[in-house]
Amino acid sequence: MHLTPREQEKLLIVVAADLARRRQARGLKLNYPEAVAIITAELLEAARDGKSVAEIMSYGTTILTVDDVMDGVANMIHEVQVEATFPDGTKLVTVHDPIR
């Protein structure tokens, strides 16, 4: 299998998000990289599902709550940006204060 650097990066995000979800399912609170991985993976999948940029930006604030993450993590993540592929091309999606 030959993957471009961009495809390798997306795969790494998915693997990190999967590990984070398994830890979350065991009742663990997420750390910074785990929270960012889950949010990023969900945003990429929403774009793949055909949602608009505006819908994804709104959805991005509902993925995790303060109760899902370790103390202080929500305050560390001011925004998450991801280049997502849409039917009409690649666009930068920014979610401000994603953990509420």
UniProtKB/Swiss-Prot annotation:
One GO process term, biological-process aspect: urea catabolic process
GO CC entries: cytoplasm
This protein's UniProt keywords: Cytoplasm, Hydrolase
Reaction(s) this enzyme catalyzes, per UniProt: urea + 2 H2O + H(+) = hydrogencarbonate + 2 NH4(+)
Pathways per UniProt: Nitrogen metabolism; urea degradation; CO(2) and NH(3) from urea (urease route): step 1/1
Subcellular location(s) per record: Cytoplasm
Keyword NAD: no
Entry EC number(s): 3.5.1.5
Keyword presence, Hydrolase: yes
Molecular functions per Gene Ontology: nickel cation binding; urease activity
Family indicated by similarity: Belongs to the urease gamma subunit family.
Quaternary structure note: Heterotrimer of UreA (gamma), UreB (beta) and UreC (alpha) subunits. Three heterotrimers associate to form the active enzyme.
Name of the protein described by the UniProt record: Urease subunit gamma
Native source species: Herpetosiphon aurantiacus (strain ATCC 23779 / DSM 785 / 114-95)
Taxon lineage: Bacteria, Bacillati, Chloroflexota, Chloroflexia, Herpetosiphonales
Name of the gene encoding the protein in the UniProt record: ureA
